Amino acid sequence: METKRSKLYLLTLGCSKNMVDSEVLLAQAKANQIYLAEDFHEADTILINTCGFIDKSKQESIDQILEAIRFKEAKRIKKVIVFGCLSERYKDALREEIPEVDCYFGTRDLSQIIAELGGHYKTHLLGERELLTPPYFSYLKISEGCDHPCAFCAIPLMRGKQVSRPIDELLLEAKKLKEKGVRELCLIAQDTTYYGHDLNGKRQLAELLQRLSDLQFDWIRLLYAYPAMFPTDILPVMRERENICKYLDLPLQHVSDEMLKSMRRGISKRKTTELIAQIRSEVPGIRLRTTMLVGYPNETEEQFSELVEFVRETQFDRLGCFAYSHEEGTEAHELPDTLTEEEKERRVELLMAAQEEIAYAKNQALVGSFMPVLIERFEANFAIGRTEYDAPEVDNEVVIALDEAEQKKVKVGTFYQARITDAEAFDLFGSLVL
């Protein structure tokens, strides 16, 4: 007797790594002829891929679970299934607090989820994904988990130790993405630069980049690079391969030596400064993105000022900043959360104000230059796109005014040469060169 298949609506919360997990699950569901609903109104089952990174993420996940429960109680759906990071970490507590959820799964339970939906996990679908991104770009998750002991981070509690995927497996998946029309490939992991060390005792990111470059994607972008023990052998590859973006996402978190030691980041301010200088020297024209964490336990005003001054001196091209979240189970949770939320937000605003000045000056320097732009969408008479130096969703956009003839020619997912005509801190403006 055949098991009845579900009509599935999948809600994905959190980061791009979660999105890839959802894409793999959707490919399995589709292969099992499970109906994939575009709207929860069409579904009998809501599946929620949760995030548990910080308090704000946890609350969003819980709010969505409770909303799904209300749909179930109103008999608009039959079943609610929860999986992902929040469920991995707090499965027992969630079962006790929200028993109305039918099933809780963790981050490694794909086959069990498919079985719960009435299907069977198909091992031959290696590398198959139903893309949730636009068809012209995609993420490639090169490893799972993390071996670093950062005191503030709960990721190892949810994702476990690092497990790198074999190069041949990644190449197979990348080829399938290329066949789907993907032109920009963004490499992601908890730490991309540690890739391969668990496979044969040595890191293999340089080799992976070379072999992916050979597949002739237009852009290959490296995200989530860890600064400690940075594999400098990737720098010649980034310099010499034209389709590897001259862009690096290098989250530093802080530069005060006292803060770095307490955070257990494994690097000093001096080593950080030397690394940035080496990257910029070996890859001329590279754009650096970083992320900073302020309001960490016992961060003094002097240490925060040191961070702001470092940002001004270093002149990062892109920068994000987060207020510290006191996460239970982490080493930092044993420290007193010394700063108020208001003070943390004040520091975020001050640091971002400093970065805004830097970003404005850097963008103004681009006025009059020409660069390729990947068009992503249209708004009224404008085409919106990104340059090689901007990652999806987090960085600058280029706003291009189109005349009537251009509106008929320009297509989403296509590269066009653009002349930059004006700039703000976080946006460029331009015209097409057709």
UniProtKB/Swiss-Prot annotation:
Q: Which SUPFAM superfamilies match?
A: Radical SAM enzymes
Q: What are the binding positions for [4Fe-4S] cluster 2 in this chain?
A: 146, 150, 153
Xref: Pfam families: Radical_SAM, TRAM_2, UPF0004
Please list the residue ranges annotated as the MTTase N-terminal domain: 6-122
So what does this thing catalyse? L-aspartate(89)-[ribosomal protein uS12]-hydrogen + (sulfur carrier)-SH + AH2 + 2 S-adenosyl-L-methionine = 3-methylsulfanyl-L-aspartate(89)-[ribosomal protein uS12]-hydrogen + (sulfur carrier)-H + 5'-deoxyadenosine + L-methionine + A + S-adenosyl-L-homocysteine + 2 H(+)
Q: Which gene encodes it?
A: rimO
Against CDD domains, the record matches this protein to:
Radical_SAM
Record's protein name:
Ribosomal protein uS12 methylthiotransferase RimO
Q: Which organism is it from?
A: Chloroherpeton thalassium (strain ATCC 35110 / GB-78)
The SS bond pairs are: none
State the UniProt keywords alphabetically.
4Fe-4S, Cytoplasm, Iron, Iron-sulfur, Metal-binding, S-adenosyl-L-methionine, Transferase
